[in-house]
């Protein structure tokens, strides 16, 4: 829905209980993250309220955002963030493994050609990890191990 209205890359998405996580890469000379999120939140509220017969405000607060490219090591931070998002439903007891989550976006980085009902664009940082998709996926798993061991990488 939103991806056909606005031009952006959705690099990660996961639904967790009462909230969701998105990693959105805006594109030069296209719409802002604020406009994209306004649309997503408005449509989500409309659909939920209609489906449940609810009226009134749906969201508690404005969305939170971080500019990944402004971190000291954007690539390391991006990969750590993907695993943080992937493991969020696991920490909440909603799944046993990020690969089994409701959306399961992490599989797009582990299985070449993996498709979901929403379009996930594999981030270009991922392709810098190796010469082939399988090599990139293997190296990407290093970040899962680091995340699970709570190793702070340099970002």
Summary of predicted features, one role per range:
Residues 1-17, 26-155:
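Short Pro-Cys-Gly-centered "Cys-loop" motif that presents a nucleophilic cysteine in a tight turn
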Residues 19-21:
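Histidine-centered active-site/metal-ligand motif
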């Amino acid at each position: 829905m939103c991806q056909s209205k606005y031009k952006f890359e959705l690099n990660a998405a996961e639904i967790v209980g009462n909230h969701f996580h998105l990693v959105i890469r805006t594109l030069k000379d296209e719409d802002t993250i604020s406009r994209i999120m306004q649309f997503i939140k408005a449509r989500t509220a409309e659909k939920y309220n209609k489906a449940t017969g609810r009226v009134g405000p749906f969201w508690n607060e404005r969305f939170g955002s971080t500019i990944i490219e402004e971190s000291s090591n954007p690539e390391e931070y991006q990969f750590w963030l993907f695993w943080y998002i992937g493991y969020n439903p696991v920490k909440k007891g909603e799944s046993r493994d990020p690969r089994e989550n409701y959306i399961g976006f992490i599989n797009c980085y582990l299985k070449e050609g993996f498709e979901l009902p929403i379009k996930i664009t594999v981030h270009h940082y991922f392709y810098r990890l190796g010469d082939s998709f399988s090599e990139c996926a293997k190296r990407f798993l290093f970040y899962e191990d680091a995340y699970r061991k709570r190793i702070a990488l340099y970002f």
